[in-house]
Curated annotation (Swiss-Prot):
<comment type="pathway">
    <text>Glycan degradation; chitin degradation.</text>
</comment>
<dbReference type="GO" id="GO:0036311">
    <property type="term" value="F:chitin disaccharide deacetylase activity"/>
</dbReference>
<dbReference type="InterPro" id="IPR011330">
    <property type="entry name" value="Glyco_hydro/deAcase_b/a-brl"/>
</dbReference>
<keyword id="KW-0378">Hydrolase</keyword>
<keyword id="KW-0146">Chitin degradation</keyword>
<dbReference type="GO" id="GO:0005737">
    <property type="term" value="C:cytoplasm"/>
</dbReference>
<dbReference type="GO" id="GO:0052777">
    <property type="term" value="P:diacetylchitobiose catabolic process"/>
</dbReference>
<keyword id="KW-0963">Cytoplasm</keyword>
<comment type="subunit">
    <text>Homodimer.</text>
</comment>
<dbReference type="GO" id="GO:0046872">
    <property type="term" value="F:metal ion binding"/>
</dbReference>
<comment type="function">
    <text>Involved in the degradation of chitin. ChbG is essential for growth on the acetylated chitooligosaccharides chitobiose and chitotriose but is dispensable for growth on cellobiose and chitosan dimer, the deacetylated form of chitobiose. Deacetylation of chitobiose-6-P and chitotriose-6-P is necessary for both the activation of the chb promoter by the regulatory protein ChbR and the hydrolysis of phosphorylated beta-glucosides by the phospho-beta-glucosidase ChbF.</text>
</comment>
<keyword id="KW-0479">Metal-binding</keyword>
<dbReference type="InterPro" id="IPR022948">
    <property type="entry name" value="COD_ChbG_bac"/>
</dbReference>
<dbReference type="InterPro" id="IPR006879">
    <property type="entry name" value="YdjC-like"/>
</dbReference>
<protein>
    <recommendedName>
        <fullName>Chitooligosaccharide deacetylase</fullName>
        <ecNumber>3.5.1.105</ecNumber>
    </recommendedName>
</protein>
<dbReference type="GO" id="GO:0019213">
    <property type="term" value="F:deacetylase activity"/>
</dbReference>
<comment type="similarity">
    <text>Belongs to the YdjC deacetylase family. ChbG subfamily.</text>
</comment>
Length: 252
C-alpha cells in the first residue's frame, strides 16, 4: 500500500539561513512543504526565494509566541511583543480569544499578500494552535476556507470533534527533533506510523544554515544536522523502499 509522506519544514521566514536551508532541503532532499511566519525577519526573502522553487508547497505558520503581532494585542503582548507566557495564560484560561481570532485573519491575509496565493495548510509556531482554547478557532477558520491543518491526533484531540470539512494528514510526528537527529530516527518515525496503519503522515523538521538569528535560538546546531540528513540520497531511497510517496497537503 502506497502511503503519503509530507516532510514539512517549519519556520520559513525566520532568517535567511533558515530560508536557504529549507530551499536546499527541497531542491536536493526530501522536504516537500514548508510553513511561513509572516512576521519573521526574513519573510520577504522567503517569499522571493520560493518563486524559484515551484515544487515547494508553502503553508502558514501561525505565530503567537515570537516577535510583533500584526494587530494590537494588548491582552497577549508585553511591551508590544509576543512570547512564551502564552502557556501560563492558557493554564489560567485568560487567553484573549477575540484578539487571537483577529490576528489569525490578519496573518492569513498577510500571507496572501506576500505569496500571491492562499497557503496550502496551517500550523503554528510552538504548536499553540493545539491549545484546547485556540484549536476550535483555527480549525473552524481552516475548514471554512478549505485549507488543511496540522493536527496532532495522538496527544490532545478526539477526532470525532473535528469539523467534517477539515483536511489533515492521518498522522503527525514532531519526533525528528533534538540532539539525536539521524536518518535512523527519521525512519523510525515512518515505521511507527506504518505500524499504526496511517495512510498519510506529516513529519515536522527545521533544516537550516546557521546565521546570527539561528544562533540565538535554543534549537540551533541540530538544524544543520537535520539538513544533512534530509539531503542524503540514502534517506530518499529508504523512504521509497518503505512504500511512501513524497507529497504535500494538496494531496490529502
Amino acid at each position: 500500500m502506497e502511503r503519503l509522506l509530507i516532510v514539512n519544514a517549519d519556520d520559513f521566514g525566520l532568517s535567511k539561513g533558515q530560508n536557504y536551508g529549507i530551499v536546499e532541503a527541497c531542491r536536493n532532499g526530501v522536504v516537500t512543504s514548508t510553513t511561513a511566519l509572516v512576521n519573521g525577519d526574513a519573510i520577504d526573502h522567503a517569499a522571493q526565494l520560493c518563486r524559484d522553487v515551484p515544487k515547494l508547497a508553502v503553508g502558514m505558520h501561525f505565530v503567537l509566541t515570537l516577535g510583533k503581532p500584526l494587530t494590537a494585542m494588548p491582552g497577549l503582548t508585553r511591551e508590544g511583543l509576543l512570547g512564551k507566557w502564552i502557556w501560563q495564560m492558557a493554564e489560567e484560561e485568560t487567553l484573549p480569544l477575540d484578539e487571537i481570532s483577529h490576528e489569525l485573519e490578519c496573518q492569513y491575509q498577510r500571507f496572501i499578500d506576500l505569496f500571491g496565493r492562499e497557503p496550502t495548510h496551517l500550523d503554528s509556531h510552538h504548536h499553540v494552535h493545539m491549545f484546547p482554547q485556540i484549536f476550535p478557532i483555527v480549525a473552524m477558520f481552516a475548514a471554512e476556507r478549505g485549507v488543511a491543518l496540522r493536527i496532532d491526533r495522538q496527544s490532545v484531540l478526539n477526532a470525532d470533534d473535528l469539523p467534517v470539512a477539515l483536511r489533515s494528514s492521518q498522522g503527525f510526528s514532531s519526533e525528528f527533533y533534538g540532539d539525536a537527529i539521524s536518518e535512523a530516527l527519521f525512519l523510525q518515525v515512518l515505521d511507527a506510523s506504518a505500524d499504526r496503519g496511517e495512510k498519510s503522515l506529516e513529519v515536522m523538521c527545521h533544516p537550516a544554515f546557521i546565521d546570527n538569528i539561528i544562533r540565538q535560538s535554543a534549537y540551533c546546531y541540530p538544524r544543520l544536522t537535520e539538513l544533512d540528513v534530509l539531503t542524503s540520497a540514502s534517506l530518499k531511497y529508504a523512504i521509497a523502499e518503505r512504500g511512501y510517496r513524497l507529497g504535500s497537503f494538496l494531496d490529502v
